[in-house]
């Protein structure tokens, strides 16, 4: 399986006061269903146990991070390995947070880092649905997600990013935030999306950037049925019908001006740009409820933690 290396932006001060954490999880298909078969951890990142609200074939896992946010000097690394035929649904109990960064660099680096990597073997299935990420005013965040899969894997996943707390008069103006999302299929890069926000580049306000919106999000869907495969010779018709269903759902939710859908190398890319994280999440859930039966042959069963 491909292993990728993320190059962090340069450190401007000698690292001090760091809190490094990593969590590596392995999920395997066993005679009793998908099981968490290996765990390696250091620091505050953890999981308790797998939940099975829809039966043994799909494990629901909640990532726990007791500090509830990332501060300057923190570096969190998360690695998820989904073995052949295993099925994982991965989520978090609450919002992730990049807090205001330290300004005094004599006590340590200002940057806050989270690096996540999913490795999917053949016929593996992974659904990655974290709660929203809140980036506070004055943050200095770097957040990356790499997905490595095969042409027979299935991946459904989203990320929802909220800039500042505008309802509390904490507008995101001076902060810095870089987000990098990549997807590799059979070691070939098919999707690369990067946004780097800083006071100097005006992407927050620019019409070709966020155009003043405070919430941006992406929903990715990849499955054999969506790309060229001899077993799916009627792919163009299926794909067209699926896109039409998604557009109809977006229209029914009156979200045409906030949501776009594109197809890149068999990967469906659905984007939201607006001001309301909850609106975005509910819309993405409705799209998941549409996509899951078609791509995974399973009805959508929401994680219990979403209702607490």
Curated annotation (Swiss-Prot):
Signal peptide limits: none
Key words, A-Z: Chaperone, Cytoplasm, Nickel insertion
Coiled coil (UniProt feature): none
Localization of this protein: Cytoplasm
One Pfam assignment: UreD
Gene Ontology MF terms: nickel cation binding
InterPro entries reported for this sequence: UreD (IPR002669)
A GO CC term assigned to this protein in UniProt: cytoplasm
Family label: Belongs to the UreD family.
Subunit structure of this chain's protein: UreD, UreF and UreG form a complex that acts as a GTP-hydrolysis-dependent molecular chaperone, activating the urease apoprotein by helping to assemble the nickel containing metallocenter of UreC. The UreE protein probably delivers the nickel.
Function: Required for maturation of urease via the functional incorporation of the urease nickel metallocenter.
PANTHER family named among the record's database cross-references: UREASE ACCESSORY PROTEIN D
Protein's recorded name: Urease accessory protein UreD
Native source species: Psychromonas ingrahamii (strain DSM 17664 / CCUG 51855 / 37)
């Amino acid at each position: 399986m491909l292993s990728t290396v993320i190059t962090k932006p340069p450190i401007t001060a000698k690292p001090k006061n760091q809190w490094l954490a990593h969590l590596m999880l392995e999920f395997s298909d066993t005679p009793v269903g998908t099981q968490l078969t290996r765990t390696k951890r250091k620091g505050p990142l953890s999981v308790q146990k797998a939940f099975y609200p829809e039966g043994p074939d799909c494990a629901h896992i909640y990532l726990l991070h007791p500090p509830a946010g990332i501060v300057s000097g923190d570096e969190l690394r998360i690695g998820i390995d989904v073995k052949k035929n295993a099925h994982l649904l991965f989520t978090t109990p609450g919002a992730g947070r990049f807090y205001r960064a330290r300004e005094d660099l004599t006590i340590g680096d200002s940057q806050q880092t989270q690096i996540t990597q999913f490795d999917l073997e053949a016929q593996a299935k992974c659904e990655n649905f974290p709660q929203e990420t809140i980036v506070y005013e004055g943050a200095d965040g770097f957040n990356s997600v790499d997905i490595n899969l095969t042409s027979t894997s299935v991946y459904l996943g989203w990320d929802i990013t909220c800039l500042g707390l505008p309802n509390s008069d904490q507008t995101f103006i001076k902060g810095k935030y870089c987000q990098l999302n990549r997807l590799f299929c059979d070691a070939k890069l098919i999707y690369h999306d990067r946004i780097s926000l800083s006071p100097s580049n005006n992407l927050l306000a620019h019409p070709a950037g966020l155009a003043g919106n405070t919430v941006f999000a992406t929903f990715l869907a990849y499955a054999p049925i969506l790309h060229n495969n001899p077993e799916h010779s009627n792919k163009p018709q299926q794909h067209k019908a699926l896109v039409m269903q998604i557009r109809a759902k977006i229209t029914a939710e009156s979200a045409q001006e906030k949501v776009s859908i594109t197809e890149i190398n068999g990967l469906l890319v659905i984007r939201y740009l607006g001001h309301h994280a909850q609106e975005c999440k509910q819309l993405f859930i409705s799209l998941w409820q549409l996509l899951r039966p078609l791509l995974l042959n399973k009805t959508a069963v929401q994680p219990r933690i979403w209702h607490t």
